[in-house]
Amino acid sequence: QSVLLKGYANEGHDSAHPDYADIGKRIGGADDMNTLMTEGAKYGAKFGIHVNAGEMYPEAKAFKDDNVRRYADGSLRYGWNWLDQAVGLDSIYDLATGEREARFDALEKLVGTNLDFVYVDIWGNNTGSSNDDSWQTRKLSKEINDNGWRMANEWGVANEYDATFQHWATDLTYGGYNQKGENSEVMRFLR
């Protein structure tokens, strides 16, 4: 049974993204999260976390002017408005500088392979780079897989190569038929 810890970070769901290693202290921190995962594994549970690689929140330590997304007129490209207003994260900058990979590596030092998968929210809707293309997606998957974790995504079309779970593709009440992933028989044949 896969269990998604959607609100593991900072103060809960969508809080302080993309500080992946900021495991909520008021919910027990890394020690309690590791206990949950090791004890849960005894019952067949495999745990994953919900992260964001396309938006960031002002309270995040990773938040800085160099990696925010802006429109041509200089205004910020805003994303989801949850605990605070998200701002688009320049995912190409994040990849090229190695900052995203370093944040995943910092998380790995805390949880290791007690963690089974990483669910990357919103990847594929172009909030991050305005082009979450296959090359970037494969690099993101590699950063996650190199730490021993499986890759999961929200959108069915976001990561057809490496995702082991896609939320919208499996949730009939989420989105229309065109949001259910790649349905091409030609593509299946070629792969």
Language-model features: locations:
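Active-site-proximal substrate-binding groove within the catalytic cores of carbohydrate-active enzymes
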Residues: L83, S91-D116, W123-R191
